[in-house]
Amino acid sequence: MTLKINTVAPDFKAKTQLGDISFHEWLGDSWGVLFSHPKDFTPVCTTELGALAKMKPEFDARNVKVIGLSVDPVDDHVKWLDDITDVCGMKPEYPIIADEDLAVAKLYNMLEDDAGVTSGGRTAVDNETVRTVYVIRPDKRIGLFLTYPMTTGRNFHEILRAIDSMQRTIKHQIATPADWKPGEKVIIVPKVSNDEAKKIYPDGWETIKPYLRKVPDPHK
């Protein structure tokens, strides 16, 4: 199945270093970030998991659960956590899926169906497409996905910014402009008429074009 924005994120059962999970049950009513990496004990991925460990309180504050994935076994995850702690100064406290049979990677379009059924003997290059971020909304639908080359570390501040934008859209019927940061002006979505906007924003708005109306960030 091809996954797109607004598709229901496929459910699955998996092993992690923190125990077995059923994905949708684990998510509950929270937002979710599912991010994958090609292989444990690799340089870029080590820095990424460490960076996310440091930023986890920011995600927690937004009701976002984070979960990693690679096709390595649980034992490798556990050993690798020591390296991440040593390099980055903080141990990841979020689950990391051990997708040894490649099932979740295939389910989420990270590997082709003919990639085999075991991670044994696979190198980081074999798994280079296992390098995706999915942001999943509380309705279990995909809100965003990004795929990176294995040589480019992910910017989790940007992922957090995108979540801030999506959460505001759901709550306040607004969109965010290019290069927007929390606290900056936002855009009233076109489907909200001027009459409706007056009820939501009684103090008015800045009209740049009839279709481009800006208001202060309503998030408190």
Functional labels for PLM-detected ranges:
Residues 1-220:
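Chalcogenol-based redox active-site neighborhoods
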